Amino acid sequence: MKEPIAEAYDFCVLISCYNNRDGLVRSLQSICYDPVKYFVLLIDDGSIEPLIFSDLTNHLSPLLNLHVIRLPRNSGITRALNAGLHYLEGRTDFRFIARLDCGDLCSEDRFHRQVGFLDGHPDIDLVGSWCVFKDFSTGEAYTYTIPTQHKQIMRDMHFKNVFIHPTVMWRAGVAARLPAYPETFPHAEDYGFFYELLQHGKAAILPYYLMVCEISPTGLSLSHRKQQLRSRIKVVRQYRDSLLYGVIGEIRLRLLMLLPSEWALKIKKQLRNI
């Protein structure tokens, strides 16, 4: 890894990978930004075939600053991301942290829009975007749109995590003062993390489709759906700032637990099919 230069980078892309090298390469190749103005921190979460630095760089810009942290065993996304945040502690050579998941694709303007927005809105600490969910094996896709203003975001957080994890970017300085991704909310660690961040700052959603997120039947959100819903209930109970919205949110989540995941996904596709 090249030696860091003070204030050299606009952002760090934080991404973890477990046995998905091809998806990782596709995701990193989709980033359209000056490669000397950002760096990638990759956490290899104990992949059976270790991710080799030289192999990855063969598929990426030679100017890209890529650092790989290899975990000795598969520890799950929460601990993998926290290992990345721990590595970043104390560094002052970048301004923002952006998330990306293996298999997901960035639009050409994603990072230009998010960096520009945060630069132009110093009161905002966390920014996400609309996105498209797509099953690449069938071509089926549906859109995900949500309110864009902080007040509406705070209201809707009682009902769901409005931030799709790989769409977000946040200020590194703010995150450095917060706890890491919580391990007390299995498979909803991002919900807890963003809700905690919202206790200390403001957020916005950009009304543009800046990501295509892969739908996979083996993805964590589907394979651990009930545990995720239980964790989401715990998040709402801990962070709600409205008793009414909190109760409505918990009832909604409990009803979702009764609905098979296949039905829930089918309903989403029918409502938002494109």
Can you describe what each PLM-predicted range is?
Residues M1-S30:
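N-proximal low-complexity "stem/linker" segments adjacent to membrane-targeting elements
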Residues Q29-F39:
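Short, acidic, metal-binding catalytic loop of nucleotide-sugar glycosyltransferases
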Residues D93-L105:
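Short beta-strand-to-loop acidic/aromatic patch adjacent to the donor-nucleotide binding site
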Residues D44-S54, R73, D101:
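A conserved acidic beta->alpha catalytic loop
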Residues G23, I48-H59, L105, D109:
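Acidic helix N-cap motif at the loop->helix transition within catalytic regions
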Residues L71-G90:
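Glycine-rich, basic loop-to-helix element that forms the pyrophosphate-binding segment
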Residues P147-S231:
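Conserved nucleotide-sugar donor-binding catalytic segment
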Residues D109-A141:
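Conserved donor NDP-sugar-binding/catalytic core segment of glycosyltransferases
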